[in-house]
């Protein structure tokens, strides 16, 4: 598979990687350093605005890859902390469906024309997954991408990834973001298999951190993959 609009014309194959930080770069090149922006003192408001922009750009790269190269046509916005996810999905693929799983008290805020909203009020992750699996809003016999990019901390990793992985009979993807160290963030994907380069700063993923000469945002992110399940076999899709 080739990443679309993520690394530019020198993009190489995007592959599943091991949990170790020694995994090879998808492009096979680690020498290029990419300065992103000048260092400057910023106000808290300006910094938050910049982080929002970078988060939206990360989601855009993920969505472009999933639509163009992975053939995903179903997206679940699981409490993403920035607006515009449904619109970004439809820009990439006009026929794609989007379901918002809304954190407590945000269903009205996240509601978008043409996108279903599954309210999280009073529901735990397991209950929400059951509702998602039985509501008919998502066909888990086909590939689906879950964007769960509200950054988690080392002490509060996401729950329900095992159950989500089991639901994805037709294969799928999980996007996560975290303020935790790389090793902790990558372990949170289990049993999903992170794609190259594992996790990297949200500002420049899918470039690995060591290829970029910038201090970054302090938020790492990545994309994990679940294989197609069926008849005792597991196939990548």
Segments the model singles out, each with a brief description of its role:
Residues 181-201:
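Short alpha-helix
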Residues 143-148, 160, 164-179:
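Conserved beta-strand signature within the Rossmann-like core of class I S-adenosyl-L-methionine
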Residues 205-237:
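Core SAM-dependent methyltransferase catalytic element
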Residues 123-131, 139-141, 153-163:
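A short, conserved alpha-helix within the catalytic core of class I
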Residues 1-127, 135-136, 165:
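Rossmann-like AdoMet
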Residues 73-75, 139-146:
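Generic beta-sheet signal
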Residues 104-105, 178-181:
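Short beta-alpha junction loops
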